[in-house]
Amino acid sequence: GSEMCIRDSSDTIQKGGTILGTARCLEFKTEAGQKKGAEICRRHGIDGLVVIGGDGSYRGAQAMSRLGINTIGLPGTIDLDIACTEYTIGFDTAVNTAMQAIDKVRDTSSSHERCSIIEVMGRNAGYIALWCGVGTGAEDILLPEKYDYDEQQLINNIINNRKKGKTHHLIINAEGIGHSTSMAKRIEAATGVETRATILGYMQRGGSPPCLCLLYTSDAAD
């Protein structure tokens, strides 16, 4: 391929995904693979790497640094699970995308007087669930950091809200807890309220970045 220049980044600021591409390399998890990577850098005269990614990418960046390659790590993950930073590239995009979907599900949940369980991504971190839950006014938010949630309390909340005249109920469930479909069946059986589970999935990893994501990314690039 040809060498990149500044013009290659023109008109990309509002695009989702990555113009560089992304992939996993199982070989790089081994010491031999890491040494091979460092040798390739030296062979091609690469005197520094900028690594954008999450936990796995940071482990790889650390390995390259230990092997003498100048390395800079930029936190890029929707999960917001990188230590020593309050923000990761992609998080706000994922939250905004998820919230738009949640609002649509809430509309139909309200129309049909249902309980909706919406599962969002985040691996073992509950930040997307927390932000989406607060931002959409969910009645309950389930986080892996607080895994000892009481399902009976969820059931009681739904029943009590019905008694107060609230006709629909929104539960945001983090990927780290999961099992949304089976949870919906148990809640419906216990409450008599029609309950549906929606797993948003990979749609959260795409979309045009909102302002906050653009600002943080530009700042990180500087």
Predicted features and spans:
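Accessory alpha-helical/coil subdomains and C-terminal extensions
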Residues: 51-53, 63, 91-194, 198
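Conserved small/polar residues in nucleotide/adenosyl-binding loops
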Residues: 1-8, 216-222
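Acidic/polar active-site rim loop that often engages polyanionic ligands
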Residues: 74-87, 110-111
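Short beta-strand elements at the ligand-binding edges of bilobed clamshell
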Residues: 84-95, 207-215
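Catalytic, metal-anchored helix/loop core of enzyme active sites in primary metabolism
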Residues: 188-193, 200-218
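Short, ordered loop/turn segments at secondary-structure junctions
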Residues: 24-25, 54-57, 69, 74-80, ...
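Glycine-rich oxoanion-binding loops at beta->alpha junctions
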Residues: 2, 7-51, 89-96, 100
